[in-house]
Regions:
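Phosphate-binding P-loop
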Residues: 18-27, 133-136, 167-168
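N-terminal pre-Walker A segment at the start of P-loop NTPase domains
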Residues: 1-20
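ABC ATPase nucleotide-binding domain signature region
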Residues: 31, 41-107
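Short loop immediately C-terminal to the Walker-B catalytic DE motif
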Residues: 147-148
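GG-anchored amphipathic helix commonly corresponding to the ABC/SMC/Rad50 NBD signature/C-loop
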Residues: 115-143, 153-165, 175
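Generic beta-sheet signal
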Residues: 28-32, 139-143, 171-173
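P-loop (Walker A) phosphate-binding loop of NTP-binding proteins
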Residues: 35
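C-terminal lobe/lid and adjacent interdomain/linker elements of RecA-like ASCE P-loop ATPase modules
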Residues: 153, 157-218
Length: 218
């Protein structure tokens, strides 16, 4: 189960707001959608500050912990892991221990790669750390805009990766995304502003006026 209550308003989140994803996480993978600035990342950063089983030396970790005091969380997960495209993209590995490990992985050579290629390197590094620690049906993985900048090929790889984590590794996966391809390939879209599940195609049509059929991953 996963239910987050905002006790003190912060950023664009209001005191008293309740985000109950319990019924939706039973589907194993959920895509959280909403406008820029509606509070999606802020809410899950606060959750990250409360429980993160892959804590790093990122300079942002103390900020996340400060946000955690604004929420109350009910969950039954033994492990919770996070990947944030902006906060975990390699630029904050400023402690020697983390830096040495990153060099060994080839991570610092990403400056010669495209944005999408670099992002995939960071995601692969993140997953190599957490996959051995996944507890079946008791692990939550939050991927925050990890698919930004991906080509269609990379988007397909990312969608299949999410399904692998949820269906093979038996982890619950929450993906925050603005990517129409991933939204339409999702089992479910959770409208953050409306706090309820929506049809992916209906959501895209409501926001853009475009009709997009559901994407079937292979």
């Amino acid at each position: 189960m996963l239910k987050i209550t905002v006790n003190n308003g912060f950023r664009n989140l209001r005191a008293g707001d309740v985000y109950d994803l319990t019924d939706y996480t039973q589907l194993k993978s959920v895509c959280v959608v909403g406008e820029n600035g509606c509070g999606k990342s802020s809410l899950f950063q606060a959750l990250r500050g409360m429980k993160n089983d892959a804590a790093t030396s990122s300079l942002y970790e103390s900020d996340f912990k400060a946000l955690a005091s604004n929420i109350t969380v009910e969950h039954d997960y033994e492990k919770i892991f996070y990947f944030d495209r902006v906060k975990d993209n390699g630029t904050d590995f400023q402690v020697a221990y983390d830096a040495s490990g990153f060099i060994e992985s080839g991570g610092f050579y990403t400056k010669s790669k495209s944005h999408g290629e670099s992002s995939m390197v960071y995601i692969d590094k993140f997953l190599s750390k957490i996959i051995p620690n996944i507890v079946e049906d008791k692990t939550l993985i939050v991927l925050d805009e990890a698919d930004a900048g991906f080509s269609l090929t990379k988007q397909k790889q990312f969608a299949n990766l999410v399904y692998h984590l949820s269906l093979v590794k038996k982890a619950d996966v929450i993906v925050i995304s603005h990517n129409p391809f991933f939204i339409c390939s999702s089992i479910l879209a959770y409208d953050f502003t409306k706090k309820k599940a929506v049809s992916a195609s209906d959501y895209i049509r409501e926001v853009t006026g475009f009709n997009i059929s559901k994407v079937e991953t292979v």
